[in-house]
């Protein structure tokens, strides 16, 4: 049974056009899939669109009623604190109202870069070595993992990457572009070769 699924909705605001309702409906269907199939952890790579669009999505689809009904803990991975004040406030609200739940875990990767995640983890480890909290010889993969944005979660069993693959027709070929870079080492990866607007949770997870 899959414990952790990660899906990266890789699409620009230009490519979304006027189809935000469709895009966010696809993301919502994925969240419903997590709940109905009792997937413990779901990580969603949010699209690079205007902050206010993300605020609208979170307020409408990931509201207090959803959180309380499903007892899901919401987390955000990435440098979300660098985003607009309105979005940061909404993120803090969700962190606050969901913090005591543990029936399921819903993570949103936003303003996230896999290389930066590893660099930031290394900086934290170096500081701990300098401050004599750990020895240099104690540094290993587990120590790096403990200092990642995703330190509290097991790596995904399955990663699904949306987006056209530069004209290639095979779903097995594509670019992960650093999504959950450290944690993707042993994950099964599916490239849908379809736009995020065409994402279908039942079909695309069945590719696995």
Protein language model regions, located:
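Flexible, compositionally biased loop and terminal segments
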Residues: 1-208
């Amino acid at each position: 049974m899959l414990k952790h699924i990660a899906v990266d909705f890789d699409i620009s605001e230009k490519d979304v056009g006027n189809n935000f309702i469709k895009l966010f409906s696809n993301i919502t269907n994925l969240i419903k899939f997590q709940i109905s199939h009792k997937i413990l952890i779901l990580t969603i790579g949010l699209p690079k669109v205007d902050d206010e669009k993300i605020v609208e999505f979170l307020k409408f689809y990931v509201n207090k009623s959803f959180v309380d009904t499903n007892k899901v803990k919401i987390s955000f991975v990435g440098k979300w604190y660098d985003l607009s004040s309105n979005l940061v406030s909404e993120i803090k609200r969700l962190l606050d109202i969901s913090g005591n739940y543990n029936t399921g875990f819903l993570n949103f990767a936003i303003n996230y870069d896999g290389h930066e995640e590893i660099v930031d983890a290394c900086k934290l480890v170096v500081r701990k070595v300098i401050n004599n909290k750990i020895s240099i010889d104690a540094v290993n993969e587990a120590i790096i993992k403990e200092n990642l944005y995703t330190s509290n979660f097991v790596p995904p069993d399955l990663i699904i990457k949306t987006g056209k693959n530069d004209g290639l027709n095979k779903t097995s070929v594509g670019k992960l572009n650093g999504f959950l870079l450290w944690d993707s080492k042993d994950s099964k990866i599916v490239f849908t070769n379809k736009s995020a607007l065409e994402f279908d949770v039942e079909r695309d997870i069945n590719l696995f």
